[in-house]
Amino acid sequence: MTRYIFVTGGVVSSLGKGIASASLAAILEARGLKITMLKLDPYINVDPGTMSPFQHGEVFVTQDGAETDLDLGHYERFVRTTMTQNNNFTTGRVYMDVLRKERRGDYLGATVQVIPHITDEIKRRIIKGAGDADVALVEIGGTVGDIESQPFLEAIRQLRVEIGAKRAMLMHLTLVPYIATAGETKTKPTQHSVKELRSIGLQPDVLVCRSDHPIDVSSRRKIALFTNVEERAVIALEDVDTIYRIPSVLHAQGLDDIVVERFGLECGQADLSEWDRVVDAKLNPEREVTIAMVGKYMELLDAYKSLIEAMTHAGIQSRTKVNLRYIDSEDIEQQGTSLLEGVDAILVPGGFGLRGVEGKISTVQYARENKIPYLGICLGMQVAVIEYARNVLGWSDANSTEFDKSSGHPVVGLITEWQDATGATEIRTEASDLGGTMRLGAQECQLQTGTLVHDCYAKDVIVERHRHRYEVNNNLLPQLEQAGLKISGRSGDGALVEVVEAPEHPWFVACQFHPEFTSTPRDGHPLFSGFVNAALKYSGKA
């Protein structure tokens, strides 16, 4: 029988509800419990797939091909549970499903309202997403008091009553600001945030108080008194040197004991030695490298959240401090490749649209001609193919049809047909909707023996996640291969190019898939580990 921990946030947004939830989940998992996590997003978009990275940050792709909130990336990095499309849903998705049922006549002519129809659909999705887990942590996006969050909070209130207090807890994150002129932390914002929650029928069981300064015992006692929360359930969570320390911080304050006692669960003690190892390797590196990351969304680094974390994980595995030099590809176009001087490796991540593409192509040329280790991901592979066609084959007009539909040598084009993660055939044209029409989710890839990528994975067949609608044009592939471009990975059916490598280069790998989505701090990822090792070798520190 599943128990539920509902996680809300107050005072301000971006307090780290996702990381706090994932950290608690990691402790409970370490105690031997089966864990799952859900993220409920209050926005009207059906999913974040077509939202600007500048507004929403990264779109995290699940194993089954769902385009979801970046918090699901945090979940998968902290726990071993694999997330699916059931672990994230939005207001838009809920309303779409309810309206579809109304059109079918499922409500038998009833007046469709927020209560009960919308709240019932939210509750149904929460229960479905929880599955057979021992504990499901359910994070509600936004801040208490937001008008968009009201249906979700009402659904939680109802669900707590329906399943009973012994199966439901509410954990509320708040901000306890430090006022430098007064020299003290202030509890009033937390008091008001809890008052707002209680006004809609929700009493927190646990308060996680975020602060950039220590919260003393008297402040915690005051918070407990005014919010009707046990003093030991007022958890102080200061800023830390690495997010992977947070499980230990929460465990030291007994948060997992509070949960286990409340739910009456029988389980062992938490073994956090894996997390201790991660923190030690992260904070005590033995060497360091500098890697240039050339992208087009550098104003909001959350657009590359999983990728940045994957580079950190690779550093943890080899006890290497990975210094990322963030470079906007438009700056390369305006200032030239001198911005890349002095780096030990170059990384070009994915992206959409024409802006900044020529800067990425110049970056690839610089890496290839100067024998600097290069890793291209998604668009980073496509620009590698375009660069090779232009500067090795001499096709000066080579391009992708995404950027130039009249190109005489469209070496990258729209995929018109493929199989999705379920095995069903998908067909797309230029006129297809942008939302939900890409090649998404886990796909098999066959690796060629004797290649760099095969050396990294040490496998003939791998499974990685995809998010793209353009691919290498098979009609021009023979000329590319004849000119030396190495095709080191193909889709499971052999129809699509998945990985390319440049000849006569110490380490040049470009892949169509997104390996960052499966990298974790405890296990790392073979491709990123190979990339960092290549950077170490290039710098002479291997």
From Swiss-Prot:
> Do you know which Pfam families this protein is assigned to?
CTP_synth_N (PF06418), GATase (PF00117)
- Is Nucleus tagged as a keyword? no
Residue positions annotated to bind L-glutamine are G351, L379, G380, M381, Q382, E402, R469
Recount the known activity regulation.
Allosterically activated by GTP, when glutamine is the substrate; GTP has no effect on the reaction when ammonia is the substrate. The allosteric effector GTP functions by stabilizing the protein conformation that binds the tetrahedral intermediate(s) formed during glutamine hydrolysis. Inhibited by the product CTP, via allosteric rather than competitive inhibition.
Q: Where would I find the Glutamine amidotransferase type-1 domain in this sequence?
A: 290-541
Q: Which residues form a coiled coil?
A: none
Offer an example of a GO molecular function term for this protein. CTP synthase activity
- Per the UniProt record, which EC number(s) apply here? 6.3.4.2
* GO cellular component, as recorded: cytosol
Annotated residues for binding of CTP: S13, D146, I147, E148, K186, T187, K188, P189, T190, Q191, K222
- Describe the reaction catalysed, as an equation: UTP + L-glutamine + ATP + H2O = CTP + L-glutamate + ADP + phosphate + 2 H(+); L-glutamine + H2O = L-glutamate + NH4(+); UTP + NH4(+) + ATP = CTP + ADP + phosphate + 2 H(+)
Residue segments, region Amidoligase domain: 1-265
Q: What does the entry list as the binding residues for ATP?
A: S14, L15, G16, K17, G18, I19, D71
Give the note: CTPSs have evolved a hybrid strategy for distinguishing between UTP and CTP. The overlapping regions of the product feedback inhibitory and substrate sites recognize a common feature in both compounds, the triphosphate moiety. To differentiate isosteric substrate and product pyrimidine rings, an additional pocket far from the expected kinase/ligase catalytic site, specifically recognizes the cytosine and ribose portions of the product inhibitor.
Q: What is stated as this protein's family in its record?
A: Belongs to the CTP synthase family.
The record's function comment reads: Catalyzes the ATP-dependent amination of UTP to CTP with either L-glutamine or ammonia as the source of nitrogen. Regulates intracellular CTP levels through interactions with the four ribonucleotide triphosphates.
Q: Quaternary structure per UniProt?
A: Homotetramer.
Quote the protein name from its UniProt record. Answer: CTP synthase
